[in-house]
Amino acid sequence: EKSIFRRFEKLKKIEKLAEENREEIDKIYKKMEGHYQKVGIVKYDAFHEMGGKLSFSLAMLDMRNNGFIINSVHSSEGCYSYTKEIKLGQCAIDLGSEEAEALSIAMGE
């Protein structure tokens, strides 16, 4: 009889621990929603006279498809970087073809 009661006590402790673990996992998922977890990158030649695909568009998005695109254009005079904000997978500013491709890759399309 004591053995059965001990097992029930252990079972109650395990159930309580499992519930605490579920709550902690839920907290972790909530925190993850705002972290960048989707990435798309496209390397390209911005100018025909430049080779090596030194320019790139990089899209970084969170779980809700919010984030940004960095476009880095490499030329013989220097390297220029531009950013565009992404909200719910959309950009208020027109995207170049490489930027749109990077966004599409990040969104899994």
What label would you give each PLM region?
Residues 1-56, 61-109:
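Polybasic/polar functional segments that serve as interface/processing modules
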